[in-house]
Amino acid sequence: MGIEMAMVRPPRCLLVNVTTGESMECLFNPTQLTEKVQVNYSRLAVPGLSHQVLQFQSTGNRQLSGVEFYLDRFFATEQPGEPDILDFHAFLRALTVPPEGTEGVVDTAPPRTLLIWPDVITVETVVTDVEFQYRQVAVDGTVLVYAATVTFEEILDARVTSEALREEV
């Protein structure tokens, strides 16, 4: 591997609002990713038995918790197009509320989010939690550096089997 490879920008994580088609590329890729799946069992107490019988109920949705997106105004000004770091803030906030003009229980949910991180993960989710931490603010109140910590939960529209998961790469 030559020095030219050191200058190649790695693929960036991308978030897509499935409802509007709007997408936002991450300024930096998250430094870590925690994936959690919960398996739910009913605990059946049988009189006289020394233990509880576990009966499978369901598998919970895959969760990606505490995904941290770091945004730095100084770094952003050096990028093509000089992205405004607060646009990412507005994009994430828009993923937490229903879109305008929706009516009815089914439609009045926040939009789904497609999380695409090349060679790592691609998953359709909803945002279940967002926390913004403003780490550096200028004297005039301009946000210079902040982190957005997001929890995503996978949305599945079809039954998943263990065989199908074994085939995923």
Model-inferred region functions:
Residues 1-169:
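Acidic, Ser/Thr- and Gly-enriched intrinsically disordered low-complexity segments
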